């Protein structure tokens, strides 16, 4: 990097290594966590549960000790309301705020006489490892999609807290609740917990029970669970590690400074894989990262800018040789995956989902023939075509991995995937593996595909293109006021009077997902060769337009332009 480049603002240096001026002051962040107190009259400082829990930063007084104490107390009361009496598993990622937030949560849980299990190795815990552990500990109990016992007796059931803001920047914190089904909590649960947490904040935390930090160590209700051993030991039940080992597939795994760092080394050792942990460094500033598209440090393993160093490392040399057959990335809690191949570079998440589905449904012979293919409605229609070729039902659901939980839990849905590089699938015998997204699993699947087929996932995608066509896909943002976003969220098909989109007859106008009839919180319009979906942003005054065309980039541009005009007209 030249001296002139170093002088540029961060937003003008995407894909380049972070500089000292780009890094957070960890001490100041932790001090803000301890001393900041939210203004409950400010919506930006209240507890808000999105699809991935509550997120914020201590610097903006949206993720502080008060928030975590209130949320944890609310979770305790939610459990009591439903008679859930088993231990709470608590895991954390490598973000600076995750450690102190775990301390807060444990103190409140113990203050309420709740049994707590933390990582027995004192390490970091990926989201999928917590999900897998919950399912393991609740094995033998028949659970409903909401996470409760079918027989109505929730006594002894285990649930969990995962402290992570996922791929968010280093100054952020995040806090998720996973009910006894192991997956993301549904809207009923998150609304209840958020409302109660905000009541507790408004009351100055009156009603929050908590032990002193000095009383945590040695507390009778505090125990340990070996998340890593359980997860790594069980991998042969879901991935053909023997095929990967025997084929000698060379894997380069980049934890991106996240919770998967110890897992990858143990996976290599335990299963005898030719696997190199590309960057084993853990730094709460994430100072080893390259900057994302907007100049922020973001552990987004689907971003070419955030993955720039790994992509560069995988570039074949003059002799056409690359150091690995596949390189992989995971975000901070390892619920997302990034796949880099020598012949294709960083794969588009939609492309890899299509490849994974095509491979799995052809190579998991014990999976029930009646099980459909789960996708979110903003994922590529290449998946629709692959599902049709496989003779499988397409199960299209709204955005949010929680919608895949019922299928993964019962085996009626053996795979669920999102366009944002999150997916999971069941074990060889059809039993659940993880009801939350599992980035390690999807990375290992890429190695299995190479081992079994002799082709890279990129090659496999080119085969799918030859068979089904080559879609152009993109997402753009369009401005919208809060009132317009609210209107978009509650549209009905009758509000859309048009019959054509970009020269094609509209075949479907959807405001509910066809796979489960749940509201999509927006609009999807489908033609023979294209579609678009519009959804309001939860954090900005914009709405997102996802669009795809099998007629090429120019037609996609036309679809996007007409989609924006249509939506703007409808929401006024």
Give names to the regions the model predicted:
Residues 2-45, 141, 153-155, 171-320:
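Gly/Ser/Thr-enriched, mixed-charge loops and adjacent short helices
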Residues 72-88, 240-247, 321:
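Glycine-rich phosphate/diphosphate-binding loops that line cofactor/substrate pockets in enzymes
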């Amino acid at each position: 990097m030249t001296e002139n480049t170093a002088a540029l603002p961060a937003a003008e240096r995407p894909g380049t290594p972070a500089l000292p001026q780009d890094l957070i002051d960890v001490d100041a962040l932790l001090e803000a966590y301890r001393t900041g107190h939210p203004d409950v009259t400010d919506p930006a400082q209240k507890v808000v549960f999105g699809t991935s829990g509550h997120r914020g930063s201590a610097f903006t007084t949206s993720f502080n000790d008060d928030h975590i104490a209130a949320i944890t107390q609310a979770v305790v009361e939610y459990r009591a309301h439903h008679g859930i009496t088993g231990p709470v598993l608590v895991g954390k990622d490598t973000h600076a705020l995750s450690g102190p937030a775990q301390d807060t949560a444990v103190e409140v849980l113990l203050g309420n006489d709740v049994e707590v299990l933390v990582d027995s190795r004192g390490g970091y815990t990926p989201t999928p490892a917590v999900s897998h552990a919950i399912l393991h500990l609740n094995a033998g109990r028949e659970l409903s999609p909401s996470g409760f016992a079918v027989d109505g007796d929730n006594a002894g059931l285990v649930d969990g807290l995962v402290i992570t803001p996922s791929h968010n920047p280093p100054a952020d914190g995040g806090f998720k609740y996973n009910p006894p089904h192991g997956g993301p909590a549904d809207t009923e649960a998150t609304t209840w917990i958020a409302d109660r947490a905000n009541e507790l904040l408004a009351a100055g935390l009156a009603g929050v029970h908590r032990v002193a930090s000095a009383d945590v160590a040695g507390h009778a209700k505090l125990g340990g669970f070996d998340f890593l051993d359980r997860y790594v030991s069980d991998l042969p039940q879901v991935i053909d590690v023997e095929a990967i080992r025997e084929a000698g597939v060379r894997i380069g795994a980049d934890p991106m400074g996240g919770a998967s760092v110890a897992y990858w080394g143990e996976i290599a050792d335990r299963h005898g894989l030719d696997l190199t942990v590309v960057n084993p460094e853990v730094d709460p500033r994430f100072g080893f990262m390259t900057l994302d598209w907007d100049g922020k440090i973001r552990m987004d393993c689907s971003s070419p800018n955030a993955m720039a160093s790994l992509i560069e490392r995988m570039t074949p040399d003059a002799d056409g040789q690359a150091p690995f057959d596949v390189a992989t990335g995971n975000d901070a809690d390892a619920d997302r995956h990034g796949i880099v191949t020598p012949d294709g570079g960083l794969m588009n998440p939609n492309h890899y989902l299509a490849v994974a589905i095509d491979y799995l449904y052809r190579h998991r012979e014990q999976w029930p023939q009646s099980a459909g293919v789960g996708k979110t409605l903003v994922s590529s229609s290449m998946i629709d075509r692959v599902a049709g070729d496989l003779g499988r039902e397409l199960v299209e659901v709204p955005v949010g991995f929680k919608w895949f939980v019922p299928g993964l839990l019962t085996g009626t849905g053996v795979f669920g995937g999102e366009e944002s590089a999150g997916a999971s699938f069941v074990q060889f015998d059809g039993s659940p593996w993880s009801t939350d997204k599992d980035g390690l699993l999807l990375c290992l699947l890429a190695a299995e595909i190479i081992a079994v087929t002799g082709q890279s996932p990129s090659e496999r995608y080119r085969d799918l293109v030859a068979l089904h066509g080559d879609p152009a896909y993109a997402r753009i943002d369009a401005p919208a006021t809060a009132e317009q976003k609210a209107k978009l969220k509650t549209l009905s098909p009758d509000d859309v009077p048009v019959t054509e989109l970009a020269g094609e007859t509209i075949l479907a106008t959807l405001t509910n997902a066809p796979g489960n009839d749940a509201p999509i919180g927006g609009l999807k319009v489908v033609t023979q060769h294209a579609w678009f979906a519009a959804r309001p942003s939860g954090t900005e005054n914009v709405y997102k337009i996802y669009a795809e065309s099998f007629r090429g980039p120019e037609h996609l541009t036309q679809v996007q332009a007409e989609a924006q005009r249509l939506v703007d007209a409808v929401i006024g």
